[in-house]
Amino acid sequence: MAALPGAVPRMMRPGPGQNYPRTGFPLEVSTPLGQGRVNQLGGVFINGRPLPNHIRHKIVEMAHHGIRPCVISRQLRVSHGCVSKILCRYQETGSIRPGAIGGSKPRQVATPDVEKKIEEYKRENPGMFSWEIRDRLLKDGHCDRSTVPSVSSISRVLRIKFGKKEDDEEGDKKEEDGEKKAKHSIDGILGDKGNRLDEGSDVESEPDLPLKRKQRRSRTTFTAEQLEELEKAFERTHYPDIYTREELAQRTKLTEARVQVWFSNRRARWRKQAGANQLAAFNHLLPGGFPPTGMPTLPPYQLPDSTYPTTTISQDGGSTVHRPQPLPPSTMHQGGLAAAAAAADTSSAYGARHSFSSYSDSFMNPGAPSNHMNPVSNGLSPQVMSILSNPSAVPPQPQADFSISPLHGGLDSASSISASCSQRADSIKPGDSLPTSQSYCPPTYSTTGYSVDPVAGYQYSQYGQTAVDYLAKNVSLSTQRRMKLGEHSAVLGLLPVETGQAY
């Protein structure tokens, strides 16, 4: 193998202190420069290319001398998966040849001589399965492993010659899976040495080395009664002591080791379910409503060109929770706001059912100063504009659930407008009585301070003469508006219940 620049190629070279017999196999692989890759053990390999045959021989030879696959992997610097696959294939088939990469295996068709033997075996023993006929062909030397027909081919021959399929094919496959390992034992494979010459292989013959194979235990199948007993014990404790495990083993007729393994697997499944439940509970805390009381939310979002202060929620316990400032809707949301104006009757009915005040459908005075770039005056519903245009028609309330403080700097806090959940539904004067020089910033986008009290009421502070100028300069679009749009819309009664969300 062309070594990596500046390094001596040492791929798969066993260490000097090993006690297994050594052979003359060269353990250095030559590859074209630039194609070699180094695995986690320091060995060089080419991705997608089979391991060389002399290294495959060495793996089988070391396994024959009792060296564990993990040690073989470290000594030869071959990945553990590669070693295990080569040994498993050798134990099952007696061959160290690599399998086909991609595509399907060529279909093995029985020759006329082999078909005659199949018919002869079937007449001698009518209850013989297809896989047994296949093994008999190998044992008697009529075929080798490269020319022996497949089980499906033998079944096809039997179906054609005898007019019916030899038993159920699915039963044949299950029997084949269950008995193939026993029939294809290492002794049986190695007993057929003469038929193991591989013409297409780089080596003259397959290695003649029997390997010790530890049989794998079959999976334990629990009955409903056993599972019921185990689940009851798991409800009492997740870590039973030795006495509890032995008692369970006697009641369920299982071994104590099986009970211990069941509890280990059950604890792993319980931890997985607990993690999924915690994730589902966390998803409910995402934006879309008020968070639980006393739970801090995201830190204040710093806007580059905005002078809005941070909104705070003051609670009775004295703890202050900082919330990001709500912002105007985006262009997509403005279309939804216009649609909300068309659903004014539904919104008014919603407010009446929930004891909100019903507002008139009048907009602000058309002579009032407006800005075509201002999304507030262009996209708000009539209810919001009617509240802002005629504050005197709404009587004040001394105790409010959410009190919205006025903007800082030049705003009149003496006069205030308030909307109470308990006040009657009465019409508000049209907006033409408002002087043209006076306008108010909607409380939806104002700097708000919420005080949570048990009384259900909403009090809105009136803004002064400079609110329009302040609004024209400072209202901007931001993604934070989407986070708080739901709760502010619910306060203003913009969300019809029957027709779904207006945004």
Curated annotation (Swiss-Prot):
Question: What biological process terms from GO does the record include?
Answer: animal organ morphogenesis; cartilage development; chromatin remodeling; dorsal/ventral neural tube patterning; embryonic skeletal system development; muscle tissue morphogenesis; neuron fate commitment; positive regulation of myoblast proliferation
Instruction: Enumerate composition-biased segments (Basic and acidic residues).
Output: 165-186
UniProt entry keywords in alphabetical sequence: Acetylation, Developmental protein, DNA-binding, Homeobox, Myogenesis, Nucleus, Paired box, Transcription, Transcription regulation
InterPro entries reported for this sequence:
HD (IPR001356), Homeobox_CS (IPR017970), Homeodomain-like_sf (IPR009057), OAR_dom (IPR003654), PAIRED_DNA-bd_dom (IPR043182), Paired_dom (IPR001523), Pax7_C (IPR022106), PAX_fam (IPR043565)
**Chain positions covered by the region annotation PAI subdomain:** 37-93
Gene Ontology, cellular component aspect: nucleus; transcription regulator complex
Region RED subdomain: which residues? 113-161
- Where in the cell is the protein located? Nucleus
Describe the function of this protein: Transcription factor that is involved in the regulation of muscle stem cells proliferation, playing a role in myogenesis and muscle regeneration.
Q: How does it assemble?
A: Can bind to DNA as a heterodimer with PAX3. Interacts with DAXX. Interacts with PAXBP1; the interaction links PAX7 to a WDR5-containing histone methyltransferase complex.
PANTHER family (alphabetical): PAIRED BOX PROTEIN PAX-6-RELATED-RELATED, PAIRED BOX PROTEIN PAX-7
What is the official name of this protein in its record?
Paired box protein Pax-7
Which organism does this sequence originate in? Answer: Mus musculus
